[in-house]
Amino acid sequence: RQSGAPLTHRPPWQFDASLGERKLRELLGVAHLGGYNAQDLVVAHGAAAALLSYAEHTQGRALAHVRGLTVQRSSELIDLPPATLRNLELIRTLRGEDSPTLLSLLDSCRTGMGSRMLRQWLVNPPRDRSVASARLGAIEQLLAQGEQPLREALRHVSDVQRIASRIALRQVRPRELAGLRETLATLPALLALLPVSDASDGLLAQAAAALTPDPAIHQLIAATLAPEP
């Protein structure tokens, strides 16, 4: 109510923990959730039941694109109540405006994906100092080599997270596929700009591994999509 977001009431049975656990197992194609370290999270199972039921209802189809599960425990994060977030003006001013806030001052991200990640980092800070140190270390490495070439390369990167979701839901538009095509073509240049070596094992090395392109996907999109859809 305070955020102004719409509120939708769901029936109590949709919060049933056993229903949520079954839905998660079916989505992930597993016999149990032990492999995700989520087998004993009864409250989370209930929340998942309602969330998945609501998403299936609004999308009008099964959520075939949900293929993974990441558990983030509250004990791993510093609890920032709404009043604290408001008083610190991390993401909203005391008047409820987007700027000036800590997020608005720090967010010079080139992509929507980066802005969303930065927001998550601010509102869900980790208790483990090594996590924050690793992030700062990666930022220092990037700044040390000069940020402008990387920012220029990121200018050609679309919001892949949202495009992937729209593809899975069969709602993607030709221009979004064109953006994905351009993003895939940009990946080699991005990889070349990351200061990593074969011996690297930090966050940038993880990013480099995740950004390794699949030429087959790029070739398929390039062959089937007009240059200017």
Give, region by region, the residue ranges found by the protein language model:
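Charged catalytic and DNA/RNA-contacting regions of genome-maintenance
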Residues: 1-141, 148, 155-168, 172-229
